[in-house]
Amino acid sequence: MSIRAPPRLLELARQRLLRDQALAISTMEELPRELFPTLFMEAFSRRRCETLKTMVQAWPFTRLPLGSLMKSPHLESLKSVLEGVDVLLTQEVRPRQSKLQVLDLRNVDENFCDIFSGATASFPEALSQKQTADNCPGTGRQQPFMVFIDLCLKNRTLDECLTHLLEWGKQRKGLLHVCCKELQVFGMPIHSIIEVLNMVELDCIQEVEVCCPWELSTLVKFAPYLGQMRNLRKLVLFNIRASACIPPDNKGQFIARFTSQFLKLDYFQNLSMHSVSFLEGHLDQLLRCLQASLEMVVMTDCLLSESDLKHLSWCPSIRQLKELDLRGVTLTHFSPEPLTGLLEQAVATLQTLDLEDCGIMDSQLSAILPVLSRCSQLSTFSFCGNLISMAALENLLRHTVGLSKLSLELYPAPLESYDTQGALCWGRFAELGAELMNTLRDLRQPKIIVFCTVPCPRCGIRASYDLEPSHCLC
């Protein structure tokens, strides 16, 4: 029978302080710093508001990662923390052990106490020192007190905690700086989004993700705020379309008002668009406004014309491109020259290439192989879902011999795997898959390689062949 070890003295002290809020407040300046993380977490979960307010004033670390405790936000607890910060901001002389410089409200997966684990809590101290030493991108200088938040707008109205925080920060401008680096929009009406943006330092925002279906006219209302995000690095757009009711002249004006904002974005590097249709025939307008070299271009399931692809291949901003993703962009009837030119521009830097489900045929593949074989940094190549014969696939594999950094390869099942009606012949697919694997192993030793069929019309899953065949779900 095992005997439970007696509680450590620190644990006994913590339990006593949680039971007696008055004692906790009166002894705060004398508490060992090792007690602060667990005591604060318990006080926050039990909503001991006066204890929270006092603990913030005496916090012995430079960073308070409150975001990890805000999974289920409580307004009164948040108010208590902010009231503690208010006291610090107005004090000429801080309490002896008080070191707080950063209130971090970002939604992270860290466990609050794990952040401070270790005998000396040296890890969070080092982390917080880095965060306070770095200049905020929106200010160009170090601030006396920083509040970090990420904005995720997914409800029709702002929740009360975020509303209170933004109003609180706005009223204390000059005493502290509220820094938001990431903005995500999932479903909030545009007038509410604009209300939020008017309370945020837009210079700080580095990443924007819009994950809700917008009309082009709505995007245009958002665009002027985008142009004020001078340090924006990444923009992700989903499901933006132009209504058929918009007259062509108005559509052109709307597109110009959106694309002209990129003239103000000197640090923009990552363009990601998914199911976006309004730029068909107008991509050149956006490309002409780019001010910096792009690292990533993602345009999946987008409507693009051949001239759009040509303009992309001519764009000087793609010469240092690391990722190109054109999944679901139909290239079947395009000349291979724009894609060849695009790869040529990025041949020295390209690391990820995704041409899945582009409808590429043998002749187009043959044209891009010479430049593809020179993409020496390529580590991920996805090409499944294209209409490629066995002979063309074997030729493709031979052209990958010099690509020593390839670690993930996804290829289509050969056309010969299907019958005349387009149905998969399972035995034939397995036979050809084994043959292709043997061909590749004679050339080099692959790391991860998979041959995939088109999606099953019934279950939507691709059958695959890597070391052995794998059926769909039917």
Swiss-Prot record:
Keywords: Leucine-rich repeat, Repeat. Belongs to the PRAME family. It comes from Homo sapiens (Human). GO terms for biological process: negative regulation of apoptotic process; negative regulation of cell differentiation; negative regulation of DNA-templated transcription; positive regulation of cell population proliferation; proteasome-mediated ubiquitin-dependent protein catabolic process. GO terms for cellular component: Cul2-RING ubiquitin ligase complex; cytoplasm. GO terms for molecular function: ubiquitin-like ligase-substrate adaptor activity. LRR repeats lie at residues 97-122, 177-201, 202-228, 229-264, 265-290, 291-322, 323-341, 347-374, 375-399. This is PRAME family member 7. Transmembrane segments: none annotated.
